[in-house]
Amino acid sequence: MAEGTDPLDDCGGFLDTEADCLDCDNLEEDLTELFDADTVSSLLDDTDQVQGNSLEPFQHHEATETLKSIEHLKRKYVDSPDKSLGIDNSVNALSPRLQAFSLSGQKKAVKKRLFGTDGDEAASGAESLQVESGFGSQQSVSDTPVTDILNANTARVKHLLLFRQAHSVSFSELTRTFQSDKTMSWDWVGGLADIHVSVLESLQTSLRSHCVYVQYDLNFAETNASSLLLLLRFKAQKCRDGVKALLSQLLGVQDLKVLLEPPKTRSVAVALFWYKRAMVSGVFSYGPMPEWITQQTNVNHQMLQEKPFQLSVMVQWAYDNHLQDESSIAYKYAMLAETDENARAFLASNSQAKYVRDCCNMVRLYLRAEMRQMTMSAWINYRLDGMNDDGDWKVVVHFLRHQRVEFIPFMVKLKAFLRGTPKKNCMVFYGPPNSGKSYFCMSLIRLLAGRVLSFANSRSHFWLQPLADAKLALVDDATSACWDFIDTYLRNALDGNPISVDLKHKAPIEIKCPPLLITTNVDVKSDDRWRYLFSRICVFNFLQELPIRNGTPVYELNDANWKSFFKRFWSTLELSDPEDEGDDGGSQPALRLHTGGTSQSL
């Protein structure tokens, strides 16, 4: 072994000191006895122990970590009071004079704030109230938003109290509330506070250029505070912001204390208040009184008893103006309430919706019966009567020539089409996109008040219902699926024979299918699967693109040009003379539903 330190030298002295000398010769048996179970019975404890709450430390640790993460997140958005006030605690702890010297610029305040807090609220955190709770803790509460709300409400309450004391009437009793400051009205009631008597003369002169009617009265409350009551009828409708800006400009006051609301125009008590106030010597009034005051204050034998609503008058009005839409009937008839007694009774009724539905249904029934009694010639003449005569028939002819459609064959097929001749009852316009097919057919449908069928509704049993109310119909942009449906179910309709149409909420009716226009991008006659339709349709090819100039079609197919076209070729189409219809030139005798004056036109 090489020279060096013996590894056993360090522990040799320990073994010599601590080792015990045994006289036993059998060392192996002694070691076995030492490690017997009886000897080490108390080394292992095999008894059952109570489990206890072993998860409590883990839960406590998780809760602590969660609170730290939330606090760290909030610190990104909420400044401490010292930081918001610009105090650096680290520098201030060393020396307050070092705070004036800085090599780096101050960090900008964060843009995002938690719960809408801003720098002002953070700065006012140090000055917030200390409110002691019932549990002995203290909570920091800022009273700035609450104070602003209370101050605003208190100012309005004080203004309303001043108005009531000065004029002996509540402002809310004279007015109705507009929630929006942008809602328009002709009439406005104003209550102005702290108005000096010297400005009344200038206000009297300046308001005449803006108002049709002016009435104002200046009174004083118990506290000697002045309050000016205004009733204004402007020459044009104005909103609350506009009236307030106008009064501020005329009075030369920037922060004007004013209450502005529209008056109650249907209250007899309010109308009497303004009528009586106008006769007081100290009240200034200019111009004629509004009609809502005069109508409710003039007592005569016609006003002693209000006339009841008559549905026949409303139906006659809608029939004369050709209104069949419920919303149009309700809105336009309500606008006549100022001049028509029956419309005024309609607005006073609680069954307006029922009256509108009944009126619309009756007008549709009358117009449907009127249309069915007319021939196609009478219907065309009826539709042309109310149109302008300044059209040019050459525009229609030039458009057909542009599409290279021969005019004479077109007129022959159009004559048979308008008569509803079997096998000639359907005209198909085929061509590429942007060739003017829909433009041509839609203009003709609009002229003759036809109906448009949409194949998208073909899964409904009622998609053919518009045919019952039309003299002409259109299927626009028919695809292959549409042609398959027509070939399967509508061959009779193309023939012009009677068909059964299912009506919603009514029993199916049998009608003769009106002439049908179809536009398509599918060449029907080139596909043999639709060979049974070849003899039932008249196809016109529109292969040229429709010319557009400055966003407007070169060939303008409007009602006036179509009217000129029909008037020019009336005899060519062999349409009957209106005088031969038996009405002395009129297309249909006038329908009178009640005795009285004529209906007001729109």
From Swiss-Prot:
Alphabetized HAMAP family for the sequence: PPV_E1
Linked residues for Glycyl lysine isopeptide (Lys-Gly) (interchain with G-Cter in SUMO): K512
Region (DNA-binding region): 138-306
GO cellular component, one term: host cell nucleus
Protein's recorded name: Replication protein E1
Chain segments carrying region Disordered: 577-602
Name of the gene encoding the protein in the UniProt record: E1
Domain annotation SF3 helicase: ranges: 405-555
Role this protein plays: ATP-dependent DNA 3'-5' helicase required for initiation of viral DNA replication. It forms a complex with the viral E2 protein. The E1-E2 complex binds to the replication origin which contains binding sites for both proteins. During the initial step, a dimer of E1 interacts with a dimer of protein E2 leading to a complex that binds the viral origin of replication with high specificity. Then, a second dimer of E1 displaces the E2 dimer in an ATP-dependent manner to form the E1 tetramer.
UniProt KW keywords: ATP-binding, DNA replication, DNA-binding, Early protein, Helicase, Host nucleus, Hydrolase, Isomerase, Isopeptide bond, Nucleotide-binding, Phosphoprotein, Ubl conjugation
GO molecular function, one term: ATP hydrolysis activity
Protein family according to the UniProt entry: Belongs to the papillomaviridae E1 protein family.
Residues annotated with Phosphoserine modification: S80, S84, S95
Motif (Nuclear localization signal): 74-76
Keyword tRNA processing carried by entry: no
Catalysed reaction, written as an equation: Couples ATP hydrolysis with the unwinding of duplex DNA by translocating in the 3'-5' direction; ATP + H2O = ADP + phosphate + H(+)
Assembly information from the UniProt record: Can form hexamers. Interacts with E2 protein; this interaction increases E1 DNA binding specificity. Interacts with host DNA polymerase subunit POLA2. Interacts with host single stranded DNA-binding protein RPA1. Interacts with host TOP1; this interaction stimulates the enzymatic activity of TOP1.
Thylakoid listed as a keyword: no
Record EC number: 5.6.2.4
Superkingdom as given in the UniProt entry: Viruses
Cellular localisation: Host nucleus
One Gene Ontology biological process: DNA replication
Residue intervals passing through the bilayer: none
